[in-house]
Regions:
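Extracytoplasmic ligand/sensor domains, especially the bilobed periplasmic-binding protein
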Residues: 105-207, 257-281
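Solvent-exposed loop/turn segments at secondary-structure junctions
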Residues: 45-48, 85-89, 113-117, 135-140, ...
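Beta-alpha junction/loop-to-helix N-cap segments that form part of ligand/metal-binding clefts
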Residues: 26-31, 51-58, 70-142, 211-218, ...
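Extracellular/periplasmic periplasmic-binding protein-like sensory domains
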Residues: 246-320, 391-392
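Signal peptide-proximal N-terminal region
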Residues: 32-37, 58-80, 172, 199-203
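Segments of small-molecule ligand-sensing domains
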Residues: 306-318, 329-384
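Short, low-complexity disordered leader/linker segments with a strong preference
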Residues: 1-38, 69, 392-395
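Extracytoplasmic "Venus flytrap"
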Residues: 31-59, 83-90, 112, 180-188, ...
Length: 395
């Protein structure tokens, strides 16, 4: 009996210690007036998507520095604490735990699809609003992703809009389309939705090809694709793989019109692919720095000038990162309490936020965390992307 009592006391003690230990792992408590709001950053600088991840991260950091130079948000400076996780999901999970437990951040600026989807349950448990550079359709599901927000059109919505544009503009019978993507959560994200929508509107998906993010030769895939004679090929890649596809397509003298989703699009593609990028069509979710007449570009130009830089020094992915951080700052501005829950509620108050033309206006509510489904399209002409549509949607 005595031993049972001692055992019970020891068990109670261990449980109490466990509870105390769990308590020490909680995320940040409410930030007091005048204290900085800490935001975590998951960056890909050296990994498989570092070609676009590096300028994107630079844009996020730049906006935070800019808004802090203006006094911050509602008396709070923003402290962005982040690191390179090299596009590796286990490293993203480790970094997330550090940001949550050690740094006590109140929200997260994330990056990839695989890591964002792997973390979404943890993010919900920890009540940390999470903006990702992944525009996976899965993140629209509020039951599974109640703290995730999409700040641009989802990959699936991008693909649907491209297919709608093809349907509306193709001449001569039923359009035949191929899909080219990498074997990652990012690459595969829009594929099933694209196939379903194509069937719905009467566009034929005739082929699919897998191309690695780091591919240096895509000849075999393109030869196989060409057997199906697609009129169009939709690419979901970043600049590196897309440039390889375009260069090999030029060598093979393919007549297919290549159309890339947002991460395949940008100045970096033209720089790498050269003449092979001519007439490539890209999905444009965010403005190019050379669109200088846009109202929102004035703030970017002001910041860069203070650093001795010019708009010409930056690319579209820098603008994309800038806009993402700007939307987060707006959510913080709207928050009644500087906690994860408070910031989420602040983001859900954003209604038709005017981004000065840097991106489509965004709206969030308690029932909808997808800010927009609109994109623009641009074609490479004489080595430069020229936008040829307004903001459009498949709806």
């Amino acid at each position: 009996m005595y031993m049972k009592k001692i055992t019970g006391l020891m068990l109670a003690s261990v449980l109490a210690m466990g509870v105390a230990g769990c308590g020490s792992e909680k995320t940040a408590t409410e930030v007091k007036k005048g204290e900085p709001v800490k935001i975590g950053g998951l960056f890909d600088i050296t990994g498989g998507t570092g070609d676009v991840g590096t300028p994107y991260a630079e844009g996020e950091k730049a906006y935070v520095e800019y808004i802090n130079s203006k006094g911050g948000v509602n008396g709070h400076k923003i402290e962005l604490i982040g690191d390179d996780y090299a596009y590796k999901i286990p490293e993203a999970q480790k970094l997330y735990q550090k940001l949550k437990s050690s740094d006590k951040v109140s929200a997260i600026l994330g990056w990839g699809t695989g890591d964002t989807e792997a973390l979404r349950q943890q993010v919900a448990t920890d009540k940390l609003p999470f903006f990702s550079a992944s525009y996976s359709e899965h993140l629209k599901d509020l039951k599974q992703s109640p703290y995730n927000f999409l700040t641009a059109a989802s990959y699936s919505d991008q693909a649907r809009t491209v297919l709608k544009w093809i349907k509306d503009n193709h001449k001569g019978g039923t359009a035949k389309v191929a899909l080219i993507y990498n074997d990652t959560a990012f690459g595969k994200s829009p594929i099933e939705d694209a196939k379903a929508y194509a069937k719905e509107i009467g566009v034929d998906i005739v082929d699919e090809q897998i191309v690695d993010l780091k591919a240096l030769d895509t000849t075999s895939q393109l030869l196989n694709m060409n057997k199906k004679a697609p009129d169009y090929a939709i690419i979901n890649q970043t600049w590196g793989a897309t440039s390889t596809i375009l260069k090999d397509a030029k060598k093979l003298n393919l007549k297919t019109q290549f159309i890339g989703l947002n991460w395949a699009t940008g100045e970096g593609l033209v720089k790498i692919a050269g003449d092979a990028s001519e007439n490539f069509i890209g999905v444009v979710t965010h403005a190019f720095p050379y669109e200088k007449d846009l109202k929102g570009m004035k703030d970017v130009e002001e910041y860069l000038k203070s650093k001795g830089q010019k708009l010409e020094d930056k690319n579209q992915k820098f603008i994309q990162g800038w806009v993402t951080a700007k939307i987060m700052a707006e959510g913080i501005k709207n928050a009644d309490k500087m906690t994860g829950d408070g910031i989420r509620a602040g983001i859900e108050k954003i209604n038709n936020l005017d981004l000065g033309g840097l991106a489509a206006n965004v709206t969030f509510t308690k029932d909808n965390h997808a800010g927009t489904n609109k994109i623009r399209l641009a074609k490479v002409k004489n080595g430069k992307f020229e936008v040829f549509t307004d903001y459009i949607s498949y709806k």
